[in-house]
């Protein structure tokens, strides 16, 4: 009886995830409303409460927004979702968007031209920019360095706390196995690295006690440590740096790979060495 109940719950969860994982939206100028209607039919996603704030990422341009999700009855919207996307994606004609949703708090989408159905692709030199709604959010140029943000006792509050970080995202994206995976550069002088809290929050990441590290030589395991202040550290990266003979001027990037795609649980970290 208990086994049948567990199977039923698993089936319901998978069904919910299947309906929201991928969907499409069409924008027509002067006809489409500012709020974006989402194919979610209740205030819960995969059995979890609807997140108030979500991250929306354009694969076509690199733009990133923090948006508010709201429910009206059984209908769910991204507040001003179309308004923000149309403005920042320079939309003047009808477009077709293909979305992927992780079921927790991150949306990715690609833009297709409505007439030709050609997929928009960004130049490798374009920067990722997070679009924010208030002073409580932080404007970020990319994930190259989060040191200034991580060490700040609190985010937002004044313009002095806002940060624009220089980017080398064109180099990073060229080396990733999947450009949609979260990634971050590593300080090669340390034996452990802090996984950026912004990355953890945006992708709703969770970690096992031990994680697989994969480089060009093979695989090994390293321990994940969570401090009392909730900071997440990956230990034992010094040996990875040494065995890959990383030279001064090179850059090391960790690409986080999750179970079954974008479901939050990190099971493997791919090591990428970017030569100077």
Swiss-Prot record:
InterPro entries: B3_DNA-bd, DNA-bd_pseudobarrel_sf, Plant_B3_domain. PROSITE patterns: B3. It is found in: Nucleus. Pfam families: B3. Disulfide bonds: none annotated. The keyword tRNA processing does not apply. The keyword Nucleus applies. Residues 144-154 have a biased composition (Basic and acidic residues). CDD domains: B3_DNA. Its main location: nucleus. GO terms for cellular component: nucleus. Keywords: DNA-binding, Nucleus, Transcription, Transcription regulation. Residues 141-164 are annotated as: Disordered. Residues 11-115 bind DNA. It comes from the Eukaryota. This is B3 domain-containing protein REM22. It comes from Arabidopsis thaliana (Mouse-ear cress).
